[in-house]
Structures are given as C-alpha cells and as structure tokens.
Amino acid sequence: MARRTKEDAAVTRELLLDAAEREFCERGASRTSLAEVASAAGVTRGAVYWHFRDKSDLFSAMCARAKLPLQTMLERAGNTPQDDPLETLRELMTTALVRLATDRRSQAVFEVLFHKCELTGELAPIAQRRQAERSLCLAHVERLLQQAIDAGQLPPDSDTSLATHALHAFMSGLMREWVLEKNAYDLAAVAPALVEMTVTGLRNDPPRRPGRVRPRVRPRSCTAT
C-alpha cells in the first residue's frame, strides 16, 4: 500500500510538471496561477503544495527535469580528465543543440525561460538560482578549456574566462533565437557545422590574456628590381 501511494505521488508530480510546461508556455510563467496549473493537471491546488513549496519551486523543478541530463554530462566532463578536451566540448555543445531541436520538453522549457518569464514577484527567487546555475556551467566549461591548455590544444596564455563567456554567449544566443523562430532552419541538421565553426575558431585563434604582447607579423621589405 505504501509503495502504491509513493508511485501515485510520483505520477501526480509528473502531471503537475507537464501541466506547468504547457500553461507557462501558453500564458507566461508570471501570468499563470498555481490553481490553473492544478486544474490543467486534473488535481487539487493542495496537491501542488504537497509537492512544491510555491510557484518558484515548481518552476525550478520543471527546468531541472529538462536540463538535468546535460548538466550532469557537463559536470562530469569538467571534473574528469579528458583525452581530447576540445572534442568533448564539441560533443557537448552539439548534443545540447540537437536535444533542443528534437525534444519538445526542452523546447517548451527554454521558450518559457527565454521569452515567457519575468523574474519578479513570485518568481523573483528564480533569478538567484539561475545565476548560480549559470556560474556553475561557466566553471565546468572553463575547467574543460584548462584541460585543453594542459593537453597542448590551446596556448598557455589563452584567456579561458573570456573564451568561456564567448562560448556561453554563442550557445545561449543561438538557442534563444531558434526557439523564437523554429522554422528558420533545421537546427539538428546544422548543429554539428555551427559548433565545428566555433570550436575551430577557438582552437586556431583563442583569446589571449592581457599583459603578454603577441609578436607582430612584419611585412616583408620590398627590394627594387
């Protein structure tokens, strides 16, 4: 009996998360009440509070369900020595884009995150959590870039912080724009080429830390004939 109750609770929790995705995506997170989420899930408002403290807790759980697999992969890559760090980075970036392009749950969550979420009022606590998640993501990527330096794939004076922020801007910007206009191009098909372009640029000419002057290429002197 206890096992059945636990299973029922897990099912109810998933129903609430599914309903939150739909309602937040349709109405916007700040304009959707917990009562509306409960109604869409076919449960009582009390069931919402059994599983989640408030709207921000529900919102966080919805996001975590969609992003957790990729976050786990990134954390493992950053904290584990890689034979080919830049190849690992390329694979992670490509996987993230392909997942977004092919997984409706990811699309719904990122559409809410990017375009239908005002982090004020009930959702104000989300801003701090998102900043913490972003900082953790950047830290894992920077560790991966440091591994690339240690492996001789990037120069010792590469500015890993600047490169990390540039990669994050590329990924978040691309995902934000594609979610806004999904029919513009086939993201799953072009993801490998887009990522390869970015990683190749990083490999060939990474940003350098200031204070170390790179040698200038002088033009050859012309001699009269």
What feature does the model see in each segment?
Residues 24, 33-34, 45, 55, ...:
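Amphipathic alpha-helical segments enriched in hydrophobic/aromatic and basic residues
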